[in-house]
Amino acid sequence: MKQLRLNPISKVHGTVNIPGSKSISNRALLLATLAEGKTRLTNLLDSDDIRHMLTALKQLGVNYQLSDNNRVCEVEGLSGVINSDTAQTLFLGNAGTAMRPLCAALTLGSGEFTLTGEPRMEERPIGDLVDALNALGADIRYLKQPGFPPLTINATGLNGGDVEIAGDLSSQFLTALLMVTPLAKAQVNIKIKGELVSKPYIDITIALMAQFGVTVINHDYQRFEIPAGQKYVSPGTVLVEGDASSASYFLAAGAIQGGEVKVTGVGLKSIQGDVKFAEVLEAMGAQIEWGDDFIIARSAPLHGVDLDMNHIPDAAMTIATAALFATGTTTLRNIYNWRIKETDRLAAMATELRKVGAEVEEGHDYIRVTAPAQLNTADIDTYNDHRMAMCFSLMAFADCGITINDPDCTSKTFPDYFAQFAALAQ
């Protein structure tokens, strides 16, 4: 197993241009596919999850041209649904942002499609989405465990009508439904059961759909109306914002050990909810400055916070490790959906924080972290989870440094993360 030793870093300073958002990249690729006309996507993320989506689209007959650096993609839209005369099997790795939306999109046209992935993908639930699609007239069947991939879709189109979907597991289920229902045969009305997690990710979806000319009526995140008879039309060019979740590590670095760290590609005009991570750092005591397309973090003494993090669960992970450098106790609440991500992130985070000496209480849907008087070095297991690796890079600001096991797992969203992180310490 590959290991990366991070020696102690006493100061960070500099500017980081954040790579494109994973969430926006894969949504935009799918909408460009369904749209009328050619769409030019700029600042596309170059990572494993995006490659899985691109490979699947090519296999499905979608024509696109990718630039040499993989950051610009011109997609020739299908002016509607995906059809296939031959049975297709698509391997989607551990990319939830490809698996869930493609599962929904492939029900719209005609053909037989089998969706598979890595072993972890077979543990990530998809049942609520499948139930909703089947209720709208789809024919989706599980090949192994009910409620989980792999699965087979016999596509004949979506009828429309009323449907319910659970809101408390993953916003990706609702995102997938929202993106495909404008192309159903009749109006679709979606009712949300329970509290909707990660509402800002739904805002991203609706904003992108609007860019492609499609309307969703949002009744306070409890009910969504998607009128029939709509079509996606290319807006010409779509700029993919920097990934706000990826920005969180650099902003935390500035807050802990700045200097001054400036991240560009996200800011006041961002459509991503994870930019609110900077407000959490501010609540902990950091100095934050905002621009339309940048955020600056400067260090100040940090103290613990007690917050509901349901709206920004991915970025919330960074607060769990930033808490190692704060006085007092930090409690992150309403984060059950950490458990169904790339790994069970609640259990993994608790285990690894204890290795470095933190006092940790792991609840069903919360984590409580108290920093020790002295942090310990350790070999941090990353669980094939990019965010675990990036979160624990912050331990380089301890006097003892840290070793990251399997650092290349960051290729899922940020292949050159550790090089960019090291550059701030020069």
Curated annotation (Swiss-Prot):
Binding site for 3-phosphoshikimate: K22, S23, R27, S170, S171, Q172, S198, D314, N337, K341
InterPro entries: Enolpyruvate_Tfrase_dom (IPR001986), Enolpyruvate_Tfrase_sf (IPR036968), EPSP_synthase (IPR006264), EPSP_synthase_CS (IPR023193), RNA3'P_cycl/enolpyr_Trfase_a/b (IPR013792)
First-level EC class: transferase
The protein's annotated pathway: Metabolic intermediate biosynthesis; chorismate biosynthesis; chorismate from D-erythrose 4-phosphate and phosphoenolpyruvate: step 6/7
Keyword Amino-acid biosynthesis: yes
Localisation: Cytoplasm
Residues the record marks as active site: D314
Gene3D superfamilies (UniProt xref): Enolpyruvate transferase domain
Binding site for phosphoenolpyruvate: K22, G96, R124, Q172, R345, R387, K412
Enzyme Commission code(s) on record: 2.5.1.19
Alphabetically ordered keywords of this record: Amino-acid biosynthesis, Aromatic amino acid biosynthesis, Cytoplasm, Transferase
GO cellular component terms given for this protein: cytoplasm
Catalytic activity: 3-phosphoshikimate + phosphoenolpyruvate = 5-O-(1-carboxyvinyl)-3-phosphoshikimate + phosphate
One Pfam match: EPSP_synthase
PANTHER family: AROM/DEHYDROQUINATE SYNTHASE, PENTAFUNCTIONAL AROM POLYPEPTIDE
Function of the protein: Catalyzes the transfer of the enolpyruvyl moiety of phosphoenolpyruvate (PEP) to the 5-hydroxyl of shikimate-3-phosphate (S3P) to produce enolpyruvyl shikimate-3-phosphate and inorganic phosphate.
Entry similarity comment: Belongs to the EPSP synthase family.
Subunit structure, interactors included: Monomer.
Protein name in UniProt: 3-phosphoshikimate 1-carboxyvinyltransferase
Taxonomic source organism: Shewanella loihica (strain ATCC BAA-1088 / PV-4)
Lineage of source species: Bacteria, Pseudomonadati, Pseudomonadota, Gammaproteobacteria, Alteromonadales
